């Protein structure tokens, strides 16, 4: 069934509690950074397609994941360089609102420095941000943007190894943490501890130190071992969001407004 949820699929096929709570839900929650309750409402078809595309359904010959030297900032630099070489002007300022084109009037971007008119405007931001910034879009576009919500997730960079499994040989790249009383209807966000040493080529000076990123930690790392705290926002792909994604092409280019981002 294309609209079947993960909860319905697990119930229909009589998967046991141990499989759900000790393997399946932790894995899915770690991937999508959401609560158990939200996971169970995900479309099973979307989940299976994602796992297939990322080589997660096979036991052997899984794809080798690679990282970019220097991190994501390196490809951002290259994009900026390519734009500048093509004589594209890059301004770094906050956009206050965007007026969609209507009645023969071009789309307008309003920022602190004034108003600028454009033939086309690309909203390369989160769906909720686009909905807040845009003025003059039709009801269909508003409904699609509103149907793809974002949620905040807290990440802490630290070196507190108490957040890794007690048995060192069990240390993995992704380490899921759950309270002993966690139940499938929990609204708590999933807690995952990423061991960066297994994910990124760290400098030699750091290779003997366990670098950890804890997402939505259930407890706090020792303050002296904390390096940085960051708030991230991630899209929530429930059934309504998946349906809205399918309808997104209907509004691309409408009123000279285009959309792109992790949610599209």
Residue positions per predicted region:
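Active-site/ligand-binding neighborhood in enzyme catalytic cores
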Residues: 1-96
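Mid-domain catalytic core of redox enzymes
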Residues: 96-234
């Amino acid at each position: 069934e294309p609209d079947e949820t993960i909860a319905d699929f697990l119930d229909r096929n009589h998967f046991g509690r141990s499989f759900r709570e000790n393997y399946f839900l932790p894995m899915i929650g770690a991937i999508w950074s959401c609560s158990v309750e939200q996971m169970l409402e995900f479309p099973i078809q979307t989940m299976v397609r994602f796992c297939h595309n990322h080589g997660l359904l096979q036991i052997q010959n899984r794809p080798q994941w690679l990282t970019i030297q220097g991190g994501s900032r390196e490809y951002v630099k290259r994009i900026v360089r390519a734009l500048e070489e093509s004589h594209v002007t890059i301004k770094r300022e906050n956009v206050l609102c965007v007026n969609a084109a209507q009645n023969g009037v071009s789309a307008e971007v309003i920022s602190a420095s004034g108003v600028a008119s454009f033939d086309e405007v690309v909203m390369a931001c989160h769906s909720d941000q686009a909905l807040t910034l845009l003025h003059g879009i039709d009801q269909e576009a508003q409904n699609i943007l509103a149907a793809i919500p974002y949620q905040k997730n807290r990440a802490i960079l630290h070196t507190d190894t108490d957040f890794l499994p007690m048995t060192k040989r069990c240390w993995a790249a992704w380490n899921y943490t759950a309270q002993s009383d966690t139940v499938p209807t929990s609204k708590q966000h999933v807690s995952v501890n990423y061991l960066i040493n297994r994910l990124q080529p760290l400098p030699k000076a750091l290779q003997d130190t366990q670098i950890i990123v804890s997402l939505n930690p259930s407890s706090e790392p020792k303050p002296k071992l904390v390096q940085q705290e960051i708030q991230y926002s991630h899209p929530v792909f429930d059934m309504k969001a998946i349906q809205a994604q399918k309808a997104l092409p209907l509004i691309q280019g409408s009123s000279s407004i285009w959309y792109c981002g992790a949610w599209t």
